[in-house]
From Swiss-Prot:
It comes from Petrotoga mobilis (strain DSM 10674 / SJ95). CDD domains: RuvC (cd16962). One of its GO terms (biological process) is DNA recombination. It is found in: Cytoplasm. Homodimer which binds Holliday junction (HJ) DNA. The HJ becomes 2-fold symmetrical on binding to RuvC with unstacked arms; it has a different conformation from HJ DNA in complex with RuvA. In the full resolvosome a probable DNA-RuvA(4)-RuvB(12)-RuvC(2) complex forms which resolves the HJ. Binds 2 Mg(2+) ion per subunit. The gene is ruvC. The active site is at D7, E67, D140. Its cofactor is Mg(2+). This is Crossover junction endodeoxyribonuclease RuvC. GO terms for molecular function: crossover junction DNA endonuclease activity; DNA binding; magnesium ion binding. Mg(2+) 1 binds at D7, D140.
Length: 163
């Protein structure tokens, strides 16, 4: 099963692609979709949609895992990220890719065993779990990998529970 993990954002959208075979995870790719600050909102949202469709076409994920939004102090940022997240969910739905959503707490818990883990701890743990040569960066890409990993672990639980 190929899992596309996504860390929603407005200027930077992290993505991570993992293949899960049995209990093993294999890294396929990870990175960041960037949008230009010079572009107006509709152009930035279109850019997210186009780049995400390219990823879907390239990797053909079976399922997707998207990080849920959490509390933002800056309302304008929260609205922008919410708009970008809407484009992401719509794109995945149009491509008939099942969408699973996880809170930051669930993701941290699945990767490190501690729901309040710091970003550095998550990155170091991912490096070990995925047998990477270097720590995954930037944060957005690492968060997306963690989201995909979380889904892979929860997916096993879903299967064992008969879902």
């Amino acid at each position: 099963m190929v899992i596309l993990g996504i860390d929603p954002g407005y200027g930077r959208i992290g993505y991570g692609v993992l293949e899960k075979k049995g209990n093993m995870f294999n890294l396929i790719d990870y990175g960041v979709i960037y949008t230009s600050k010079e572009d107006e909102l509709p152009k930035r949202l279109l850019n997210i949609d186009e780049q995400l469709r390219n990823l879907i076409e390239t990797y053909k994920p079976d399922e997707s895992a998207v990080e849920k939004l959490y509390f933002f102090k800056n309302v304008a940022t929260a609205i922008q990220v919410g708009e970008a997240r809407g484009v992401i969910l719509l794109c995945l739905e149009k491509e008939n890719i099942p969408i699973y959503e996880y809170t930051p707490f669930q993701i941290k818990q699945a990767v490190t065993g501690y729901g309040r883990a710091e970003k550095g701890q998550i990155q170091r743990t991912l490096k070990l779990l995925l047998k990477l040569e270097k720590t995954p960066t930037p944060d957005d890409a690492a968060d997306a990998l963690a989201t995909a990993f979380c889904h892979g672990n929860f997916r096993r639980s879903f299967k064992n529970a008969g879902y």
